[in-house]
Amino acid sequence: MDAANLVMKSSLFSKSPCPLFSSKLIPRAPPSVFTLPSTFRPLVKCIQASFPPNPDSKKPSNNSTFTCSAVTSFPSQQSQPHAPSDAKLQLLISEFQSLVEPMDRVKRLLHYSTLLPPMDASFKTPENRVPGCTTQVWLNVSFDEAENRMKFLADSDSEITKGFCACLVSLLDGATPDEVLALKTEDLNALNVAGLNGKGSASRANTWHNVLVSMQKRTRALVAEREGRPRGELFPSLVITADGIQPQGSYAEAQARFLFPDESRVQKLASLLKEKKIGVVAHFYMDPEVQGVLTAAQKLWPHIHISDSLVMADKAVSMAKAGCEYISVLGVDFMSENVRAILDLAGFPEVGVYRMSDERIGCSLADAAASPAYLDYLKTASTSSPSLHVVYINTSLETKAYSHELVPTITCTSSNVVQTILQAFAEVPDLEVLYGPDTYMGSNIAELFTQMSTMTDEEISAIHPLHNRISIKSLLPRLHYFQDGTCIVHHLFGHEVVEKINEMYGDAFLTAHFEVPGEMFSLAMEAKKRGMGVVGSTSNILDFIKERVEESLNRNVDEHLQFVLGTESGMITAIVAAVGKLLGSADSSSGGAKVSVEIVFPVSSESVTRTSTGSPLDQNKVNIIPGVASGEGCSLHGGCASCPYMKMNSLSSLLKVCQSLPHGKAELSAYEAGRFSLRTPKGKQIADVGCEPVLHMRHFQATKRLPEQLINQILQPRDNGRSSSA
């Protein structure tokens, strides 16, 4: 008989002799306590008492009574209140794994929810909410200094979620801090409660994980307080509400200063753009002052677009079709080169393309791909055939052209690189893939595929339908990546930053660009597994934040969402605009719950310029300025808060270009994005050969397959050349 039935029939047992035990007991024996064997941890205890025989009866005494009652607490709290947490976990795992049917596991959770001690209403505050749960979950954590043990209270407005909380409280309430911190989220996977094979399974698994992460974060804080360790300084952040923004810290104040630009400057720029028929395409990473003005000017002149590098050229073509005679590119040089080449291909050679500086606007990543070392890497690694070079879009046309003549090449973005590589492996047997130039992204791709090799075929198929564990394991030794190329911005997310995020922001939403170092990548991937993170492009990051905000608004409860921004701080302008629009719309339409969104800048201690201000009397005052003091300004441990190259795209330069057109073209010759006059080693035009890998990518994005032309290039003999024009 299972424990659930025993609980239901306890009243019956109390009224009748127990059929499970012999009645031949010693008269007047003291009461005995028995525990019925059961996998159900809330115990059913039975007390048997023997009574003297009835003197009026002629029959042998058989009047023992056996009373059973359900005990509404966990066995670990009854007999071994301080049993090791790992031992409790094994008991809990055994219990749930013994339940074959998913519905039985749900019923068990529902029963556990009835055992969870009630939480006082005063603890159900927004500060005690557990982030990342689809239902409301509250957690209160305290520390018993005398016993050196943690105390946990939890509650939820969902009965199933209360069951999850009850299990975790039973494991960790009364545990030492070390025991709490030693438990890993993957340790909970064996409980198999998430294996319901139905809607909501992932969110159920996320509940285990997110409640545990919050328990651990608050445990660390209490232990640090007890040991007298000063709390680490919080990262700067911006809090966005329907009423506006609130910067936290000097760095955030510097960012926020430009989000609400002077209206006269906005009007002046918009009027110039309209008068001169100038379109503007700008990258997310440019200077926040310029972004603020451009974002406001979009309302007055529609031909302004801020995006990642891939979309910039497409928007430039759209602007040319709409009648723009000039395009101003706010980005690094390879972006303006790409815009120039794509406009030419689209039939708009007469449209002028202008950079924002008369000096070179470089890029550490593009420079790495233009080095002799990169071409040597391609020559060495491509000795095996068939081979394909997958090159990051953030490289020059020259790099794409020279590479394509060495190895068949397709470009990629951080949002489509995984699908591009997996599709290539699926379509071309025994393919060798050479990725470059970003070392961090290459390492992260390899790590992702390694993780996939341990997934189930069903999980792998959800990522790419043509792969399984066997195919993923077989492709790992055939994936290669360049070892000496990094973006100086994403290099900042190194050990120091990751340690602080893990310590103080473990329960926040984590966003990371695919180019960040491995530690930050792993941290964000772990968060992604429990629905609390995203790894991808700038557009992926923006979409993730908007989706989480929309979900929160739909829940219609007061909530504070915290996002760690694991990419260049210039993204904040687009984020504030998008989030502010969502919050403002909800506030005006419903007047319901208040949702606030905090964007955290994980700034390395070496990533800011500190300058004294004012007179010598103000020596103790320090201003924190986004960016670096000079040059690239990056330490060995990562120190760029923002891209120094992107910051060359100043508002004054943009105004100068606009004011000089059309009659001052001669003065702007150094600003113009020129066409390539050089040819490839095979004598072809750089623009023609360099654009072909981009066109291959566009075909892949449209069809989800490699173009037939590229497959033919991969399979053809190596000495026949690579481009279609060869």
Curated annotation (Swiss-Prot):
It is an enzyme of class 2 (transferase). Pathway: Alkaloid biosynthesis; nicotine biosynthesis; Cofactor biosynthesis; NAD(+) biosynthesis; quinolinate from iminoaspartate: step 1/1. Residues 1-67 form a transit peptide. InterPro entries: Fe-S_metab-assoc_dom, NadA, NadA_sf. GO terms for biological process: 'de novo' NAD biosynthetic process from L-aspartate; alkaloid metabolic process; nicotine biosynthetic process. Binds 1 [4Fe-4S] cluster per subunit. The active site is at C133 (cysteine persulfide intermediate). Its EC number is 2.5.1.72. One of its GO terms (cellular component) is chloroplast. It comes from the Eukaryota. [4Fe-4S] cluster binds at C363, C487, C643. It catalyses: iminosuccinate + dihydroxyacetone phosphate = quinolinate + phosphate + 2 H2O + H(+). Its cofactor is [4Fe-4S] cluster. Iminosuccinate binds at H283, S309, Y392, I393, N394, S414, H513, F514, E515, T538. One of its GO terms (molecular function) is metal ion binding. PANTHER family: QUINOLINATE SYNTHASE, CHLOROPLASTIC, QUINOLINATE SYNTHETASE A. Involved in the biosynthesis of pyridine alkaloid natural products, leading mainly to the production of anabasine, anatabine, nicotine and nornicotine, effective deterrents against herbivores with antiparasitic and pesticide properties (neurotoxins); nornicotine serves as the precursor in the synthesis of the carcinogen compound N'-nitrosonornicotine (NNN). Catalyzes the condensation of iminoaspartate with dihydroxyacetone phosphate to form quinolinate. Homodimer. This is Quinolinate synthase, chloroplastic.
